[in-house]
Every structure is written in structure tokens, then in C-alpha cells.
């Protein structure tokens, strides 16, 4: 999965964001298993990239929830 920019994430619906998070978590787990079994990572920065993307999605979801409560 490619890196999602904040502007791209903001265009997604809440359900699409949840789906992306689930997909990224599966990919993160797969990369973690590969790392723990001693396999060489295909891209060394991929794990941190996935974690950052998950955090970015969660942050935007929380921003949208806060805006909905204040509106």
C-alpha cells in the first residue's frame, strides 16, 4: 500500500478509513512476522511508514469526530 497523504485521507468516508486501518494493520503484522523470523525486509522503512500512515488516519478520524461534536 502506498503512503496516503492527509489530503487524500480527508476525502475518505469513516467506513473507508476503518477499512484502510484494517488493511494497514494486516500489512504491518505481515511485515512484523517477516522481521521476527529473520527474513530480510523488502523495504527497511516500510514498518515505520505503515505505523505513520495508521497514526495519520486515526488523527484525522479524531479531528472529524471533534468537529462533529462542536457543530
Curated annotation (Swiss-Prot):
- Using the record, list the residue span of the signal peptide; answer none if the entry has no such feature: none
Q: Name one Pfam family in it.
A: Ribosomal_L29
Record InterPro entries: Ribosomal_protein_uL29 (IPR050063), Ribosomal_uL29 (IPR001854), Ribosomal_uL29_CS (IPR018254), Ribosomal_uL29_sf (IPR036049)
Per the record, its GO cellular-component terms are:
cytosolic large ribosomal subunit
Respond yes or no to whether keyword Disulfide bond is given for this record. no
Q: Which GO terms describe its molecular function?
A: structural constituent of ribosome
Q: Which cysteines are joined by disulfide bonds?
A: none
Q: Which domain of life is it from?
A: Archaea
Query: What keywords are assigned to this protein?
Result: Ribonucleoprotein, Ribosomal protein
Might you name a Gene Ontology BP term for this protein? Answer: translation
Family, according to the entry, reads as follows: Belongs to the universal ribosomal protein uL29 family.
Q: Which NCBIfam families match?
A: L29
Protein's name according to its UniProt entry: Large ribosomal subunit protein uL29
Look up and give the organism this protein is from.
Methanococcus maripaludis (strain C5 / ATCC BAA-1333)
Gene designation per UniProt:
rpl29
Amino acid at each position: 500500500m502506498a503512503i496516503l497523504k492527509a489530503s487524500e485521507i480527508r476525502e475518505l468516508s469513516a467506513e473507508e478509513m476503518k477499512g484502510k486501518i484494517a488493511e494497514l494493520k494486516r500489512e504491518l503484522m505481515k511485515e512484523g512476522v517477516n522481521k521476527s523470523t529473520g527474513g530480510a525486509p523488502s523495504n527497511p522503512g516500510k514498518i515505520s511508514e505503515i505505523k505513520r500512515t495508521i497514526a495519520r488516519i486515526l488523527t484525522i478520524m479524531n479531528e472529524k469526530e471533534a468537529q462533529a461534536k462542536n457543530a
